[in-house]
Amino acid sequence: MDAAAVISLFILGSVLVTCSILLSSFSSRLGIPILVIFLAIGMLAGIDGIGGIPFDNYPFAYMVSNLALAVILLDGGMRTQASSFRVALWPALSLATVGVLITSALTGMMAAWLFKLDMIEGLLIGAIVGSTDAAAVFSLLGGKGLNERVGSTLEIESGSNDPMAVFLTITLIEMIQQHQTGLSWMFAVHIIQQFGLGIAIGLGGGYLLLQMINRIVLPAGLYPLLALSGGIMIFAVTTTLDGSGILAVYLCGFLLGNRPIRNRHGILQNFDGLAWLAQIAMFLVLGLLVTPSDLLPIAIPALLLSMWMIFIARPLSVFAGLLPFRGFNLRERVFISWVGLRGAVPIILAVFPMMAGLDNARLFFNVAFFVVLVSLLLQGTSLSWAAKKAKVVVPPISWPISRVGLDIHPENPWEQFVYQLGADKWCIGAALRDLHMPPETRIAALFRNNALLHPTGSTRLREGDILCVIGREHDLPALGKMFSQSPPVALDQRFFGDFILDAEARFADVAQIYGLDGGEEFREHQQSLGEVVQQLLGAAPVVGDQVEFAGMVWTVAEKENDHVLKVGVRVAEDEAE
């Protein structure tokens, strides 16, 4: 490749990335998932589009996509809270194993019938599209305000279900090449190997990487690069040993994000930009790889297969996978069924048959691409609507416009939060001494009209003021309510109820005040309101959990770890309003 070709490649790549970034602003206006825009730009630049670029380098696409996935999952793992694992680990693992098997089998049988393939080839299509995609889930669920149980289950499922899909795909390709029709006992061994090595190397390598970051003194800008290179190495080593590199890098990120780590906020800030770049590059390359004119002949059967997977296979697999977990109500199960988002992973898995030289490899790739496109357009665009209908959205809190870590020491948890006060904030006009600040938080600075003030307790807040608050991550919910829109309890009242009670209050006293019937066993044992709600829920509580009892609707309004702190209450008849 001569110098002119290299420069042309740089120009082409920068133009495509720039167009992707600029056009991403239309995503929210049009209600289209941003990943679809990246994919569409790649298709427009491809052989059938206005760019006319011929691209069929599958090994290169495989390399770029795997590198991008490693970056996205490392970033996603760092942002996953340990509390999410406590709430959703086992349900998510059930969906990642049993759920993927059921989805793949049902989708595969339908694919064999629709495309008139051998059953094993149909099952290969089912395996290729059988897992949800972490890049799509992390991108589309961000900022939706889902309750912790639902959001965490979907995120952990998407980060851990790829090993099963990858293993099924590779196994079925080998069976087709060797003309086998049955599975051997090695099937189970390989599954255990994928998960076992992924977990062991991910956590072990993540721990070693954490120690390295905390013990070596480097310029601040090098810590994100050290974390990135270490995560990619863990991904590559695990994959080389026939383990799940995707699971390993996700767990590595999870460990780094939930332990004290040097320059934590610098790492996260850099990872945010890198994850966006990875998503853009991955979907551009995958868009270039497809030939849109090849999708037209298979459009009808591929659309039918997509509908079968979305409306039949995915719901059946979710209901079966969540059967042992009674903490999920019907609305939550239905919503999780709907959010079976497909993205880059099925397209990457569809490259495997191309590289293996299977007879119908092009058909497998085109079907997988079509299914991903339908999933992103149908499920991705309706996500917000479905969440509201299923009532799995909790009232949002006001987040700071900026967060800066005070990285004095790896063990130091303190941060600076910056809030800008608009006219709709309830605290406008309030004196600083009247603000009920969370314990151990301090207002470090107050800016007004670009000037730094020296406030006193009598200083009153005005529209446009910028507050710098020193606190810790667990203070964000309380600070968010303090700087929320006016009136501060309006949304809480609509969602949680007319009154929010302390969970330590005795149920007997609450029942007497409200004149409630029933619950004699709780009164006799002098149980607190929080204990009663947790017992009725039968699962680890999350904010937004509701239970109807004694003619009232009780809603978890605040919790810490697995303990309920505040409970909202309203008359049950209000549900119908």
Swiss-Prot record:
It holds the Pfam family TrkA_C. It is a multi-pass membrane protein. The keyword Transport applies. It is found in: Cell inner membrane. GO terms for biological process: cell volume homeostasis. It catalyses: K(+)(in) + H(+)(out) = K(+)(out) + H(+)(in). It comes from the Bacteria. One of its GO terms (cellular component) is plasma membrane. SUPFAM superfamilies: FAD-binding/transporter-associated domain-like, TrkA C-terminal domain-like. Residues 403-485 form the RCK C-terminal domain. InterPro entries: Cation/H_exchanger_TM (IPR006153), FAD-bd_PCMH-like_sf (IPR036318), FAD-bd_PCMH_sub2 (IPR016169), Na+/solute_symporter_sf (IPR038770), NhaP2 (IPR023729), RCK_C (IPR006037), RCK_C_sf (IPR036721), Transptr-assoc_dom (IPR005170). SMART domains: CorC_HlyC. One of its GO terms (molecular function) is potassium:proton antiporter activity. The chain crosses the membrane at residues 3-23, 30-50, 58-78, 95-115, 122-142, 185-205, 216-236, 237-257, 280-300, 303-323, 334-354, 363-383. Belongs to the monovalent cation:proton antiporter 1 (CPA1) transporter (TC 2.A.36) family. NhaP2 subfamily. K(+)/H(+) antiporter that extrudes potassium in exchange for external protons and maintains the internal concentration of potassium under toxic levels. HAMAP family: NhaP2. This is K(+)/H(+) antiporter NhaP2. The gene is nhaP2.
